[in-house]
Swiss-Prot record:
Gene3D superfamilies, per the entry: Rhodopsin 7-helix transmembrane proteins
Name this protein carries in UniProt: Type-1 angiotensin II receptor
SMART domains: 7TM_GPCR_Srsx
Predominant localisation class: membrane
A Gene Ontology BP annotation from the UniProt entry: regulation of inflammatory response
Bridged cysteine pairs (disulfide): C18-C274, C101-C180
Gene: AGTR1
Organism: Homo sapiens (Human)
Keywords assigned by UniProt, alphabetized: Cell membrane, Disease variant, Disulfide bond, G-protein coupled receptor, Glycoprotein, Host-virus interaction, Lipoprotein, Membrane, Palmitate, Phosphoprotein, Receptor, Transducer, Transmembrane, Transmembrane helix
Membrane topology of the entry: Multi-pass membrane protein
Annotated glycosylation sites: N4, N176, N188
Ranges where the record places region Disordered: 335-359
Result of changing R167A: Abolished binding to angiotensin II; abolished binding to olmesartan inhibitor
Amino acid sequence: MILNSSTEDGIKRIQDDCPKAGRHNYIFVMIPTLYSIIFVVGIFGNSLVVIVIYFYMKLKTVASVFLLNLALADLCFLLTLPLWAVYTAMEYRWPFGNYLCKIASASVSFNLYASVFLLTCLSIDRYLAIVHPMKSRLRRTMLVAKVTCIIIWLLAGLASLPAIIHRNVFFIENTNITVCAFHYESQNSTLPIGLGLTKNILGFLFPFLIILTSYTLIWKALKKAYEIQKNKPRNDDIFKIIMAIVLFFFFSWIPHQIFTFLDVLIQLGIIRDCRIADIVDTAMPITICIAYFNNCLNPLFYGFLGKKFKRYFLQLLKYIPPKAKSHSNLSTKMSTLSYRPSDNVSSSTKKPAPCFEVE
């Protein structure tokens, strides 16, 4: 969408140079349907994750703190998804006013940064728990995890401020519709470039490199352990899990990041071809569905890597209430790996346990 604006009587009015870009009947049907599916699956799955971690597992490990906050961040975003479904079904007509436009937009931005930051911290925590369990015991505490989550929520909130400030309801004169959109003044290119690069670098590139590095080091440590024990099948299983985690993150977000960058170029007028604008505006909601659907599945995905989480989850589905007394647990769990390659060389004869337990 290429926008030109004017102000009359204090009302922001916009001329869209490519009024038909991204406006296809199949988009107006398919995207609201996908949003509805994401909403139902996400609310159901993440609510169960919160119940399992908080009431059944009693929130006793560092990893469970991160997963709980991940599920809560997803729920905050999912509550605004019906607004976007209605907006798309009404052919990009925003009927909810300027206030909800800002709140819903900030929620999308907040979820992006909060989820990515939490997944990054979770990967670092897994690295410390598996590769340096003894050295990291003093750092991997519940207090540190909770403070880290508070900092993440504050940073995500800070990163969402541009959506609150610059996202507004505009009236497009040549199509006679009201939209909820970002609009940048053509003479001020610093802001959109800065926001686009922040989203690409801080919201994807740096976290991906940290996640990739953390899980690569985990795999190398486990590979060494399993080679000593001559346990090749187990080594292959761990490699597949780690590859799934890294690729799951990468392919969920890379399409959205690419088209976000192209959208900024269109907004700035660097790209003026309406055919390219149509491709970007058509692809953008599809990439959002891919990114945020996978994002909302993350708590379930990571949780089901642990046997206890899986057991409690199935127990909840059978309406079995949590026990009054909780089990005692070591603070290093989510990895119950008994072989410690960096801290306990003499334990090479021990049999490794599952390495991604939540509790």
